[in-house]
């Protein structure tokens, strides 16, 4: 995107080398995927950074046609840091983001986003099942970090 005397990279053009931490890199990949956007590699990632672009569980969201939405359209409030959406198979994806400079707890009551009952939770970044969730999801999120959970009906 350009204009007179200005150039701005499109939001889905990701240069991982410009981020200060792995937590920021995970957030930079996760947010466009949660919003249903593509991921475009626009730098020369090293072997470590390349792994962020090769997370098959996260890339499966895009292949499914997933498009999530923020819990509330409050750009600066904490509720804008919670994203969710449903996959074609009926499972859900919930993303908890932290824009703060320090670690913070992010929580969402599942019924408030239309999710009812008990679900198996899987952390898509670390490829681990996290047990059963119902009622509320709450997690300590590192500064500029995120947690992306896939919820599958029990």
Where are these regions (language model features)?
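Short, solvent-exposed S/T- and G/P-enriched segments that are highly enriched in secreted/extracellular
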Residues: 132-137
């Amino acid at each position: 995107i350009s204009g007179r005397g200005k150039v701005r990279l499109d939001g889905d053009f990701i240069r991982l080398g410009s981020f200060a931490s792995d937590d920021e890199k995970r957030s930079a990949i996760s947010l466009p995927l949660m919003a249903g956007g593509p991921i475009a590699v626009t730098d020369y990632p090293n072997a470590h950074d390349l792994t962020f672009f090769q997370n098959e569980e996260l890339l499966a969201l895009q292949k499914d046609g997933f498009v999530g939405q923020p819990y509330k359209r409050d750009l600066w409030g904490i509720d804008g840091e919670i994203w969710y959406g449903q996959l074609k198979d009926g499972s859900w994806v919930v993303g908890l983001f932290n824009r703060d400079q320090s670690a913070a707890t992010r929580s969402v009551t599942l019924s408030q986003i239309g999710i009812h009952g008990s679900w198996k939770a899987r952390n898509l970044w670390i490829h681990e099942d996290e047990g059963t969730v119902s009622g509320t999801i709450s997690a300590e999120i590192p500064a500029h970090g995120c947690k992306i959970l896939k919820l599958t009906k029990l």
